[in-house]
Amino acid sequence: MYRHKLLRKLYNYRPSEGEEQEALKETTAFVETYKDCFERSCPVGHLTGSAWIENFDGTKFLLSYHRKLKFWVQLGGHPEPGEHDILQVALREAKEESGLKSIVCLHPEIFDISIYRFSDGKEPPHLHFDINFLLKAVDPKETIKVSDESEDLRWFSEPPQYDGNQDVDNIFRMFNKWKQHQQRSL
């Protein structure tokens, strides 16, 4: 039952061409097939909720220098046990990982979809089916606070430099979508 809300979002989503189209197809099939798609115990993988967060005036976006991955990524994470609303997962994770309480959803529909192969040595290799939403930190007086999951948090106006060893096409794709969103909002 709880998968239906997410499946409606997936069926209505129009991805960018290429890699994201394939990610949408695979994510939709995963959610249709696995009733435990929100649970970390699902052997194939699980859903994660992430956030592209813009600042109060829409001029910058927030990224985390991830403690385990060792490069800049959008904020996000796993559903808690029994949590089945992926937008709420993204909002909760964004607030927890940034320390910002004023984060709101700019649009309740999916902003981007990616799939990551994950292996940390503690768990068997599995997939993260990552659903991203466009969020906004609306209070200009709030300051970001680095959580245990990050080494750093920073507002950017352009994507950071990467050394070429990371799969970060999604960061550039989301940056371009965000710029298009800003143009439409003018």
Where are the language model's segments positioned?
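Generic N-terminal amphipathic, Lys/Arg-enriched alpha-helix
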Residues: 3-14
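NUDIX/MutT-family hydrolases
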Residues: 143-174
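Compositionally biased, intrinsically disordered linkers/stalks adjacent to structured regions
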Residues: 173-186
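Short, well-ordered beta-strand micro-motif
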Residues: 53, 134-136, 154-157
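Conserved Nudix-box catalytic region and its N-terminal flanking loop in Nudix hydrolases
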Residues: 59-100
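Acidic, metal-coordinating catalytic segment for phosphate/diphosphate chemistry
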Residues: 12-50
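Active-site segment of metal-dependent pyrophosphate-handling enzymes
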Residues: 99-141
